[in-house]
Amino acid sequence: MEQWRNLIHINRNFQKAVNLQLDIGDHGRIEHYIPTRSSMLILRRYLKAVTGEAKEHATVLIGPYGKGKSHLLLVLLSILSCDLPQSVFEKIKITDPETADLVTQIRKENKKYLPVLVSSVPGFSMNQILLFALREALEKNGLSDIAPETAFTEALRILEKWEKEYSDVYARFCEYLTEHQTDVQDLKKNLKRKHKQSLELFKELYPMLTAGSTFMPLMQSETIRSYQQIIRSLTEECGYEGIFIIFDEFSKYIEGHEKSGFAEDMKTLQDMCELAESSDQKLFFTMVAHKSIHEYT
């Protein structure tokens, strides 16, 4: 018996569940992935969608607890971030050469997607949850300076509100602008023209007039429009192919959701899925569940 104990060891890597929020980009966790033929079938379907060989842009990944769904998605995001460790690629190549060929194709074409990880937040609507996840993804990847059209329109809306309802705040804002050698009319004109410098100035002054709060236009906007605009900026200005959204623990969200607001949240999810399906490989949306959606009804 002692001899067997010296020969057989438990791989501790199997004992720790993958947390996408914490483990994304962690090469150590990614390198511990062990490809199987069944998991490669799933990975291959995702990669074929990315390369345009399949049209599955909005999907639900279903499997029981401990099946390796999150670890598989961790590897997928690594591929779509052009950051897959070579050791994992070699393991994929041995297990499934066809999937490895798709990985190689994505590497050659430099198909890079911004990963957006969605988690349910009690008390928040699905609109807010999706926007929060997008803002967090942009910040984490050094893309906070991306300015969608909603940022300019929201700044103009706030200025109009200050002018009509908070004259003292508006007057102080005008004074600050004078210190920066400009005036409110010029600022408004430049905001309408989508000048980034004017938006940066507004963002700089905003905390001085709102007790230190941060200007967060994404959190005040409409989900579909915001994602459309961010995708446009990512593809035209930042070298990305688009966005890949993963709603991990979607099961817990469904099980814990109160009846109030449920229909509206489901409509938001449906709209996002429809946007993904019509996005021409620029948006993918995957929800992770432990059983069929019909079983939750």
Where are these regions (language model features)?
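Substrate-engagement module of ASCE P-loop NTPases
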Residues: 227-237, 264-284
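P-loop NTPase motor core
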Residues: 30, 59-64, 71-189
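Conserved P-loop NTPase "ATPase switch" module shared by AAA+ and STAND
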Residues: 235-265
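Walker A/P-loop-proximal flanking segment of P-loop NTPase domains
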Residues: 1-67, 74, 79-82, 93-98, ...
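Conserved alpha-helical scaffold flanking the Walker A/P-loop in AAA+ ATPase domains
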Residues: 99-107, 226-239
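Short regulatory helix/loop adjacent to the ATP-binding pocket of P-loop NTPases
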Residues: 293-297
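Structural recognition of the conserved hydrophobic beta-strand(s) that form the central parallel beta-sheet
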Residues: 244-248, 281-290
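Long, low-complexity, polar/charged, intrinsically disordered or flexibly structured peripheral segments
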Residues: 175-227
